[in-house]
């Protein structure tokens, strides 16, 4: 069986933490920021993590991460 290919679009968007979780950036932070509160924008700067239900799917997309 040939090697599995990593989906490059996903590889650029996710990093693996030391414990093996997938770290991601949060959405809704690129434009239309004037109507969002200071608190909301501050929370969007923090990292998000892939949910456990999605991790199995992501492991197929990113086999070598």
Swiss-Prot record:
GO cellular component: cytosolic large ribosomal subunit
SUPFAM superfamilies, alphabetized: L35p-like
Record keywords: Ribonucleoprotein, Ribosomal protein
Superkingdom as given in the UniProt entry: Bacteria
Record-level Gene Ontology MF annotations: structural constituent of ribosome
GO biological process annotation, one example: translation
Alphabetical list of Pfam families matching this protein: Ribosomal_L35p (PF01632)
Keyword Protease: no
Ranges annotated as spanning the membrane: none
NCBIfam families associated with the record: rpmI_bact
HAMAP family on file: Ribosomal_bL35 (MF_00514)
Listed PANTHER family: 54S RIBOSOMAL PROTEIN BL35M, LARGE RIBOSOMAL SUBUNIT PROTEIN BL35M
Family, per entry: Belongs to the bacterial ribosomal protein bL35 family.
Record protein name field: Large ribosomal subunit protein bL35
Classification lineage: Bacteria, Bacillati, Bacillota, Clostridia, Eubacteriales
